[in-house]
Swiss-Prot record:
Residue ranges, Extracellular side: 44-261
Annotated ranges, domain THD: 122-261
Role noted for this protein: Cytokine that acts as a ligand to CD40/TNFRSF5. Costimulates T-cell proliferation and cytokine production. Its cross-linking on T-cells generates a costimulatory signal which enhances the production of IL4 and IL10 in conjunction with the TCR/CD3 ligation and CD28 costimulation. Induces the activation of NF-kappa-B. Induces the activation of kinases MAPK8 and PAK2 in T-cells. Mediates B-cell proliferation in the absence of co-stimulus as well as IgE production in the presence of IL4. Involved in immunoglobulin class switching.
Protein name in UniProt: CD40 ligand
Biological processes, Gene Ontology terms: B cell differentiation; B cell proliferation; CD40 signaling pathway; inflammatory response; integrin-mediated signaling pathway; isotype switching; negative regulation of apoptotic process; platelet activation
Entry-linked Gene3D superfamilies: 2.60.120.40
Glycan-modified residues: 240
Compartments (UniProt record): Cell membrane; Cell surface
PROSITE patterns: THD_1, THD_2
GO molecular function: CD40 receptor binding; cytokine activity; integrin binding; protein serine/threonine kinase activator activity; tumor necrosis factor receptor binding
Gene field: CD40LG
Any single Gene Ontology cellular-component annotation: cell surface
Subunit structure: Homotrimer. Interacts with CD28. CD40 ligand, soluble form: Exists as either a monomer or a homotrimer. Forms a ternary complex between CD40 and integrins for CD40-CD40LG signaling.
Length: 261
């Protein structure tokens, strides 16, 4: 009887090598990443620390400079034989520059204020007054949503806006009227924007007309006037109509105003 014996093959020593290599590479990667993060944090810390040291050094230099000026003013002499005259001249020049900058800023602010005073905003907006039904020159009142910016424009006698500053003005008027009332004549309803200058005759700046209507009830119609004109100090503007009894004085119907450009 022949017996066969199979000898087991020896275990390869290289089977554990890949596992060890993976562990080594993993640890090496973690080490490199940690080192990179640590280096970045250290760089940030070092940069901030250097900035802080630089600020402290500048403050120290300023402190030394001020102490040196104090010693020069008191007549003391340091061991380094500092040139007090040169240091004083540098300090005086520095202070002079600061004062000049302040003076320039003050002049700029003063110029802006003077410019605002020279060109103030002038505006006015007034509302019609019902008492103007008996006169061809419409009357106005400072009521409701009115505007009177300052004393450079005034409402005189309730009839005219007078300006005290020369310039270009946008002047406007809106007149609303009832067109089917019994009119004294068959002539169209006419609204005129007029100017009265000091020492001159009155003259018409703008004029608009609208025909009467037979519609009932009362048919409200509006006339709009507006334009840009050069006004002299003391000039007055007013609104004239052919039939004041037809003018509507309800809220927002009839108004008058100007604005300096």
């Amino acid at each position: 009887m022949i017996e066969t014996y199979n000898q087991p093959s020896p275990r390869s020593a290289a089977t554990g090598l890949p596992v060890r290599m993976k562990i080594f590479m993993y640890l090496l990667t973690i080490f490199l990443i940690t080192q990179m993060i640590g280096s970045a944090l250290f760089a940030v810390y070092l940069h901030r620390r250097l900035d802080k040291i630089e600020d402290e050094r500048n403050l120290h230099e300023d402190f030394v400079f001020m102490k040196t000026i104090q010693r020069c003013n008191t007549g003391e002499r340091s061991l380094s034989l500092l040139n007090c005259e040169e240091i004083k001249s540098q300090f005086e020049g520095f202070v002079k520059d600061i004062m000049l900058n302040k003076e320039e800023k003050k002049k700029e602010n003063s110029f802006e204020m003077q410019k605002g005073d020279q060109n103030p905003q002038i505006a006015a907006h007034v509302i019609s007054e019902a008492s103007s039904k008996t006169t061809s020159v419409l009357q106005w009142a400072e009521k409701g949503y009115y505007t009177m910016s300052n004393n450079l424009v005034t409402l005189e006698n309730g009839k005219q806006l007078t300006v005290k500053r020369q310039g270009l003005y946008y002047i406007y008027a809106q007149v609303t009227f009832c067109s089917n009332r019994e009119a004294s004549s068959q002539a169209p309803f006419i609204a005129s924007l007029c100017l009265k200058s000091p020492g001159r005759f009155e003259r018409i700046l703008l004029r608009a007309a609208n025909t009467h209507s037979s519609a009932k009830p009362c048919g409200q119609q509006s006339i709009h006037l507006g334009g840009v004109f050069e006004l002299q100090p003391g000039a007055s503007v007013f609104v004239n109509v052919t039939d004041p009894s037809q003018v509507s004085h309800g809220t927002g119907f009839t108004s008058f105003g100007l604005l300096k450009l």
